[in-house]
C-alpha cells in the first residue's frame, strides 16, 4: 500500500441523510473512523441528519469550500439528492457507493411518487458513469448492477454488520406476551412491496392450518409512507380468515432484541434486496433462517440457513414445519449460520477500504467534468420527456421535435 501522510489530504463522505441506527448510517460512521485512524482528514457532509447525529456532520454546502482536485469524495448515491449533485460538479476524485435502488415497478398503484423517484434515480445513476474514479457496490449483486449500467471501474465495499443495537436488555413486555410456548415466525424489515409480505402471510396461513394451530406471525417494521400497502395486507389477512398475525410497526432496539429472542424461525420472502441486514441479525441472534433465493439474498446467506427457490405456500409451510419440529436440523442450520457470521466478522473493513482509497489515489486522473450551470435542470427536463415517452406516449408524440430530442449540455 502507498504511504498515507495525510496532512492536507482529505477523504470526505457525502450523502443525503445520515440516519440513526440504520445500516447505511452505521457504515458511514465506521468508514469515518477507519479514515481518521489512517491519518486522513474525513468529515461527513449531509443535507439532513438524525438529531442525535447532527453534531457529527457538516452541511453539504460547506463541501464547496473544502473541495480540492487531490481530495477524494466517498459519495453514497441517493435519488435526486442536492448533496449528490453538488458532489458531481466538484473537481475532487470520486468513489461512488451504491446501496441499491428498488425497481420502480414494485410501487406501481402503491406509491406513485416513489415510482417516479426510483425510475429517475436509476437513470440519474447512469450520469455518474464518466464522473466516478471507482464505483462500489456494498454487495456483489450491487456491483454487477453498476457494471450493467456501464461503470468500467467497479469493486465491492462489503457491509460490515454492527450488532451493538441488539446487545441491549430485551423489552420484558414483548417477552411476556409472546414467549408462551407457541411457535413464533418472525420477519423484520420495512412494510414495503418488494419485501413480499403477502407471501409471508400465505406461507404462514398454510403452516398454521396444516401443521401448527399454536403459531403466530410477527411482522416487525415500519409501514411509514406505505399505509396503502399495509391496508392491502390487512385485507389479505381478513380474506384468508387467519388469526394471530401481528404488525408491530416501528420498534425500539430493546423491543427488536426481544422479538428476536422469542422467535423460533426467521422467514423472509423478499424479492429484491441489495443486501438484507435482518438476515445476518437473525444469524447473530441464533434463529434458523428461511429465505427466498432472490437477488442478493443467496450471497448474504453465504451458504447458511435454508434457501427456497419457489414461493410456493405448500413447500414453504412444509419447510417451516421441518425446521421447527426437528431440533437436530435446527442445530445443523445454526452451525452453518455461525460459520457464515464468523466469515463476515473476519472481513476487516479497514484494509479493504484503505486499499480502495489507494487504488483511486494511484489511478490516472479522469478528464475533468465541466458542468454547465443548468446541467441538472437539463437532465431533469430530459428525464421528464423520457417519462412521457414511456407512460404518456400520446402526449410525447404531440411535443415539438426539438423538445423530444432534448439532451444535456456539459
What kind of region is each of these model predictions?
Residues 230-254:
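Nucleotide-activated donor-binding/catalytic signature segment of Leloir-type glycosyltransferases, i.e.
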Residues 279, 288-291:
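Short hydrophobic beta-strand element within catalytic cores of glycosyltransferases
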Residues 271:
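Aromatic "clamp/platform" in nucleotide-sugar-dependent glycosyltransferases that forms part
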Residues 46-50, 214-231:
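Glycosyltransferase donor-sugar binding loop
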Residues 136, 176-195, 201-204, 218:
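Conserved donor-binding/catalytic core segment of Leloir-type glycosyltransferases
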Residues 129-172:
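Donor nucleotide-sugar binding/catalytic pocket of nucleotide-sugar-dependent glycosyltransferases
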Residues 258-263:
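Short alpha-helical donor nucleotide-sugar binding micro-motif in glycosyltransferases
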Residues 306-313, 322-327:
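Conserved acidic donor-binding segment of nucleotide-sugar-dependent glycosyltransferases
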Amino acid at each position: 500500500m502507498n504511504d498515507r501522510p495525510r496532512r492536507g489530504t482529505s477523504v470526505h463522505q457525502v450523502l443525503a441523510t445520515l440516519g440513526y441506527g440504520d445500516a447505511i448510517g452505521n457504515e458511514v460512521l465506521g468508514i469515518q473512523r477507519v479514515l481518521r485512524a489512517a491519518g486522513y482528514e474525513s468529515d461527513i457532509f449531509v443535507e439532513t441528519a438524525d438529531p442525535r447525529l447532527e453534531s457529527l456532520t457538516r452541511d453539504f454546502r460547506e463541501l464547496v469550500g473544502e473541495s480540492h482536485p487531490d481530495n477524494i469524495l466517498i459519495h453514497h448515491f441517493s435519488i435526486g439528492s442536492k448533496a449528490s449533485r453538488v458532489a458531481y460538479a466538484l473537481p475532487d476524485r470520486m468513489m461512488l457507493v451504491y446501496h441499491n435502488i428498488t425497481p420502480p415497478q414494485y410501487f406501481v398503484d402503491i406509491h406513485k411518487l416513489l415510482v417516479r423517484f426510483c425510475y429517475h434515480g436509476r437513470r440519474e445513476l447512469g450520469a455518474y458513469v464518466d464522473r466516478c474514479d471507482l464505483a462500489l457496490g456494498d454487495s456483489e449483486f450491487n456491483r454487477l448492477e453498476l457494471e450493467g449500467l456501464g461503470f468500467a471501474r467497479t469493486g465491492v465495499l462489503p457491509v460490515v454488520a454492527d450488532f451493538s443495537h441488539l446487545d441491549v436488555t430485551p423489552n420484558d413486555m414483548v417477552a411476556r406476551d409472546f414467549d408462551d410456548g407457541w411457535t413464533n415466525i418472525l420477519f423484520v424489515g420495512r412494510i414495503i412491496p418488494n419485501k413480499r409480505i403477502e407471501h409471508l402471510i400465505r406461507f404462514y396461513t398454510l403452516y398454521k392450518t396444516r401443521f401448527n394451530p399454536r403459531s403466530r406471525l410477527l411482522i416487525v417494521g415500519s409501514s411509514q409512507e406505505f399505509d396503502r400497502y399495509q391496508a392491502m395486507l390487512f385485507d389479505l389477512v381478513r380474506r384468508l380468515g387467519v388469526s394471530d398475525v401481528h404488525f408491530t410497526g416501528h420498534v425500539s432496539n430493546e423491543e427488536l432484541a426481544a422479538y428476536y429472542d422469542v422467535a423460533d424461525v426467521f422467514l423472509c420472502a423478499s424479492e429484491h434486496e441489495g443486501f438484507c441486514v435482518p438476515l445476518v441479525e437473525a444469524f447473530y441472534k441464533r434463529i434458523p433462517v428461511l429465505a427466498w433465493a432472490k437477488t442478493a439474498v443467496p450471497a448474504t446467506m453465504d451458504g447458511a440457513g435454508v434457501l427456497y427457490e419457489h414461493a410456493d405456500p405448500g413447500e414453504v409451510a412444509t419447510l417451516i414445519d421441518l425446521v421447527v419440529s426437528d431440533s437436530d436440523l435446527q442445530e445443523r442450520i445454526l452451525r452453518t449460520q455461525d460459520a457464515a457470521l464468523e466469515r463476515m466478522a473476519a472481513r476487516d473493513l479497514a484494509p479493504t477500504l484503505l486499499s480502495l482509497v489507494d487504488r483511486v489515489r494511484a489511478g490516472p486522473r479522469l478528464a475533468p467534468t465541466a458542468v454547465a450551470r443548468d446541467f441538472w435542470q437539463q437532465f431533469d427536463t430530459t428525464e421528464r420527456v423520457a417519462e412521457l415517452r414511456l407512460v404518456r406516449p400520446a402526449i410525447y408524440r404531440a411535443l415539438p421535435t426539438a423538445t423530444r430530442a432534448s439532451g444535456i449540455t456539459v
